[in-house]
Amino acid sequence: MSQDFVEIAKIGATYKLDGELNLYPLASSIETLLSYGDWYIQLPANSAWQPLKDESVLRRADKLYIKLASVNDVETAKKYVNSLIGVPKEALPKVGNDEAYFTDLIGCTIVNTANDSFGKVIGIIETGANEVLVCKKDSDEYLIPYVKQYIVSEDLDLKKIVVDWEYDY
């Protein structure tokens, strides 16, 4: 049985000659990122998640860096650039009613109350005021605010969201 993982960070360019790498959180805060237990890594050329052992996460001002145990020079570190850091999905805190992790919304089919299809959710834009679902159907793209006012129902097990929205909004 394969385990589901949620991406929590992305490794960026090398930072120091000893193999430190920039670390970019995908979580809402650095504290949230650091609160997760065991981390896993997915290399750019490999879809398998591997456990990270003895990594060090360094915080300098408002930036994060990662030092992998087996990496001691820039050339070795370059192999890890653009890798993803993840945690098992079951390690995430349970969400409350009317809440969902963004990762659970990606891939959901979107239809309106008239059963017109808006395709699938391919991304989410955070605007500050609210989130916006980016939906794609064929070559068309639709932006639908992810707010209670427009969400009629959500079944994440069936990957289906019904919205009170029209094509011409």
From Swiss-Prot:
It holds the Pfam family PRC_RimM. Keywords: Chaperone, Cytoplasm, Ribosome biogenesis, rRNA processing. GO terms for molecular function: ribosome binding. Residues 97-169 form the PRC barrel domain. GO terms for cellular component: cytoplasm; ribosome. It is found in: Cytoplasm. The keyword Cytoplasm applies. GO terms for biological process: ribosomal small subunit biogenesis; rRNA processing. It comes from the Bacteria. Binds ribosomal protein uS19. The PRC barrel domain binds ribosomal protein uS19. Belongs to the RimM family. An accessory protein needed during the final step in the assembly of 30S ribosomal subunit, possibly for assembly of the head region. Essential for efficient processing of 16S rRNA. May be needed both before and after RbfA during the maturation of 16S rRNA. It has affinity for free ribosomal 30S subunits but not for 70S ribosomes. This is Ribosome maturation factor RimM.
